[in-house]
Amino acid sequence: MSNSQPPRSSSSSQERAEELRRLLNRAAHAYYVLDAPDMEDPVYDQLYRELQDLEHQDSTLVSADSPTQRVGGRLADGFRSVSHRISLFSLDNAFNRDELHGWYSRLLKALDRTPAAGSPPPTLPMVGELKIDGNALALSYENGVLVRAATRGDGEQGEEITANVRTISSIPLRLHLEPVPAWVEVRGEAFIPDATFHAINNERLSRDESLFANPRNACAGTLRQLDPSVVAARRLDFFAYTLHLPDEWQERRPLTQWDALQWLGDAGFKVNPNAGLLPDLQAVEQFFDTWDTERRQLDYATDGVVVKLNDLRLQDAAGFTQKAPRWAIALKYPAEEAPSKILRISYQVGRTGVITPVAEFEPVGLAGTSVSRASLHNADRLVELDLHDGDTIVVRKAGEIIPEVVRVLPELRPALAQPLEITKTCPACGSTLVRESNESATRCINSSCPAILRGALRHWVSKGAMDIDGLGSKLIEQLVDRGLVQSIADLYRLDMALLGSLERMGSKSAENLIQALNASRSQGWAKQLYGLGIHHVGDVNAKAITTAFPNADSLNQAACHAPESITAIFGVGKEIAQSLQQWFSSPANQRLLDELRSLGFSLSLNEEEQSRATTAAANHHLTGSTFVLTGTLPTLTRSQAKEQIEACGGKVSGSVSKKTSYLVAGEEAGSKLTKAQELGVSILDEEALQNMLRGST
């Protein structure tokens, strides 16, 4: 039996909808963030259904902060890339007290507070926060309403996942503030609590689905689901830890990191309750030691402690390096260790012929994953460990990421166990291995070695080199093992008939691969040089080298007859020049270059590279100039502006200092603008920057 309600007027419906949103959002905050429910479930459900009915009757009542919008419709086309209003920097790490004190000394130097010889260092109050092992999110609010959520990405750009983030109940859809700033940027960590993670894996086990390795992987995979209802079902959580406000809120903004955390809590965010206000380095060490012991009692993973300078004005003064803030450091917990038994030594052959011994041992669980292999790096490490057949070893994850063998337990060694020695022959081709007197690496020097060829091909097709889609490791293995490809050049002789003879290669896939191979012929000279896999020549050095030597002939001439002209390039040393000399002196490599030319490769700068080189030459006056970018530019993203400045010889820094030549300021420029004005740094808008890039004054 139902009770009919008289129809509401549009104004009363709007008022009721606003009231329901307020009540429901307050109840959700009390339940999910404060862990102090103030509304019975049946009451919440009744009010929720009433709001749903109102919004269904009048779609204009639906708002972005409505609790009914936490789970949206399926995303049709994946995720789009978005630029962050404010960059997300990574943190430098410290793994012991010496590294912590080293960071503190650098911080004092950046703040011009280095003590005189023999004097104790000044104390600076810090805030200690647990480093949550999850996934960083950038949340954007406008007029108090969540309008965008994005992954960290590369720090400049991330993937927009707003629909998924709306499902996280500990993230407010509307800020609990009055009045609200025009915009707010919040940073924090999404994560899956341990109990939730185990429940998810139990559900997957019951459906015979593969299990997630650890909560962090589960969280990352969940955030990239195309269906927000799947995200909602996995019950992600979130801790907020960083806040950015517009300049017009200068008088209202927090002055310390501690106050910023309180601000975030007042605004409706869940803030980790275990943060601490720390007066000095000794308190930092005590905070770290406490949580290194007590972290196992928590219901979520934490892999360290983050220490931040408390005074936000001093944070601005300390600034940033190219990749990290000077005013913060991540103190990582000692790596988790576990014993295991050695089974065998296997070997990997790199693309330059380097032989890497790999310890294979009985599987052990470390930091949430199962580990059964660890690199031993080279023969010296094998000797240093004194590994014997059947030894019990201690394994850990360095930085809780990379497995490594720490030591051997000789007291558990079996009787008559034999020492394990590095192989004398290549495991891939059987050739005798060599070792130069000045190197720790043991190498295969057989140019026909299939393992070296496979590595060279993988490098050539990689994203940083020729970026050839559809040519993965499995396919490369087939091509090499069947003798269809014996050099990089052979890739460009593949046709539909040859590809069609391979396993799992349909006509459409073969057609796409041939198109990708043909398209790669037009890649720039820098990518081609990098793709050749010359020892010590990375992608950055390749750009510098090809700008100085615009084609293979000029580089060949310099490498073989004038190596000093190569070392004259900024950032290129003797080691690289020697590698280039050795590579270009090889008849086999000269044949490869001839083959590539015959297959349509120019082995010279393409139009885009020539344009950049011309621009750099025309604007050589930017060499020696340091730029800082702040705010939003009208047409250029920060990445584009940085790339163009660097192409003209300039350097881009993350913070303003006495050494800054120019500050490029866009809309909503922050404290960097104020500091630049105080220091008398020249201020440019985008138009002035563009004129400078063109060489105009």
From Swiss-Prot:
The alphabetized list of GO BP terms reads: DNA repair; DNA replication
Which residues catalyse the reaction?
131
Gene Ontology cellular component annotations, sorted alphabetically: cytosol
- Where, in this chain's numbering, is Zn(2+) bound? 426, 429, 444, 449
Identify the residues that the record assigns to the BRCT domain, covering every copy.
617-697
What enzyme category does the UniProt record give? ligase
What UniProt keywords apply to this chain's record, in alphabetical order? DNA damage, DNA repair, DNA replication, Ligase, Magnesium, Manganese, Metal-binding, NAD, Zinc
What's its EC?
Answer: 6.5.1.2
Q: Which Gene Ontology molecular function entries are recorded, alphabetically? A: DNA ligase (NAD+) activity; metal ion binding
- Enumerate the transmembrane spans: none
Q: Which PROSITE patterns does the UniProt record give?
A: BRCT (PS50172), DNA_LIGASE_N2 (PS01056)
Keyword Iron-sulfur (UniProt):
no
Q: Per its Swiss-Prot or TrEMBL entry, what cofactor is needed?
A: Mg(2+); Mn(2+)
**Origin: domain of life:** Bacteria
Annotated residues that bind NAD(+) are located at 41-45, 90-91, 129, 152, 189, 308, 332
The reaction(s) annotated as catalysed by this protein in its Swiss-Prot or TrEMBL entry are:
NAD(+) + (deoxyribonucleotide)n-3'-hydroxyl + 5'-phospho-(deoxyribonucleotide)m = (deoxyribonucleotide)n+m + AMP + beta-nicotinamide D-nucleotide
Q: What family name appears in the similarity comment?
A: Belongs to the NAD-dependent DNA ligase family. LigA subfamily.
- State the function annotated in the UniProt record: DNA ligase that catalyzes the formation of phosphodiester linkages between 5'-phosphoryl and 3'-hydroxyl groups in double-stranded DNA using NAD as a coenzyme and as the energy source for the reaction. It is essential for DNA replication and repair of damaged DNA.
Q: Which PANTHER family match?
A: CHROMOSOME TRANSMISSION FIDELITY FACTOR 18, DNA LIGASE
Q: Please state what the protein is called.
A: DNA ligase
